[in-house]
Amino acid sequence: SPDVYQCMTYIRNHTNEPISVEAAAAHTGRSASYMMKHFKGELGIRMGAYIMRCKLEEAKSLLTYSEKSLAEISSYLCFSSQSYFQNVFKKQYGITPLQYRKQTKGRSN
């Protein structure tokens, strides 16, 4: 639906801000409960999980194409702490951010 697409676009374009489900929903002019229901129904993923996925995808890009430190990346993407960022990244991808950086740097050389 246009509302879900607009919400997804807003989330992808604001990964470097502390995005909440409420803020993303408000951007569409809909209530958080309305957007959560439709988001999950259409995409099969909760909005909060999608927000985290987008932040982690941006982190992967920064790890690959920038020299930013983990502290800079976690701060830029508005994680509450570097250790939280590292834990969430490892839980999602099975490796630490530094291991990911080493792997991707090795492939590009």
Per-range role (PLM):
Residues 1-9, 13-36:
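Cytosolic nucleotide-utilizing catalytic cores of signal-transduction proteins
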